[in-house]
């Protein structure tokens, strides 16, 4: 298995937190390789190169959303080409537990490494009480699929119940190909919304292995590079 962290080079926020994640991973014997993120300002060139289109128009000036998606997309392609599972981290991911033994035997397609809602006011308390004395794997249930389903319960994005944050997950090659093939037909949506259970099976670990970086707690919207073009 390969470990990759998406880092926006020459961006102080991204580099600082990515470096902290890599250093923390080493304390658990995990070597994480950097992946230089695609800058959102270059998204048109990459869409032309990849021959893919968005499923719908993204919010104005949200170039960070394009850059984030493209970074994940290129890693999905690498995962397929290498034909080995990838652990994909964003710069705001942070290891708090070692990778469980035989982890690859315990999920089918995608494993989210945090079963908690990073937007919850109780996130830190729930994380602090976690223990790796016993590891469980359960089907993923988006804790707050706000505005993602219509009144009949149909996914507006077409991807189903998707990840609430893509800061730490493992994906197997056949699952990455499922996502790539879906995009070729339907177009793409933001990276975390792209990984949905209408496309791939999703399990989560209990307790958490990779959490949202502590610096982001309560400040996700303020520090997010996807939501704040001025930070890019």
Regions found by a protein language model. Name each.
Residues 1-89, 93-232:
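An acidic/histidine-cluster motif and surrounding catalytic segment
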């Amino acid at each position: 298995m390969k470990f990759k962290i998406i880092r926006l080079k020459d961006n102080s926020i991204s580099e600082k937190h990515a470096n902290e994640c890599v250093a923390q991973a080493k304390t658990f014997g995990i070597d994480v390789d950097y992946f230089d993120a695609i800058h959102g300002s270059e998204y048109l060139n990459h869409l032309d190169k990849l021959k893919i289109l968005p499923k719908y128009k993204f919010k104005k000036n949200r170039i960070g959303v394009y850059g984030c998606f493209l970074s994940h997309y290129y890693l999905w392609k690498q995962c397929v080409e290498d034909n080995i599972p990838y652990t994909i981290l964003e710069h705001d991911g942070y290891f708090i537990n070692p990778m469980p033994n035989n982890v690859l035997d315990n999920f089918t397609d995608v494993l989210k490494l945090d079963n908690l809602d990073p937007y919850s006011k109780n996130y830190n308390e729930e994380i602090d009480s976690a223990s790796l004395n016993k590891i469980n794997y359960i089907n993923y249930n988006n804790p707050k699929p706000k505005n993602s389903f219509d009144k009949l319960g149909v996914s507006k994005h077409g991807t189903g119940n998707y990840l609430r944050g893509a800061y730490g997950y493992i994906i197997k090659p056949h699952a990455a190909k499922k996502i790539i093939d879906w995009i070729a037909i339907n177009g793409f949506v933001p990276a975390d919304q792209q990984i949905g259970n209408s496309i791939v099976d999703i399990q989560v670990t209990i307790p958490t292995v990779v959490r949202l970086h502590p610096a982001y707690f309560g400040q996700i919207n303020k520090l997010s590079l996807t939501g704040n073009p001025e930070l890019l």
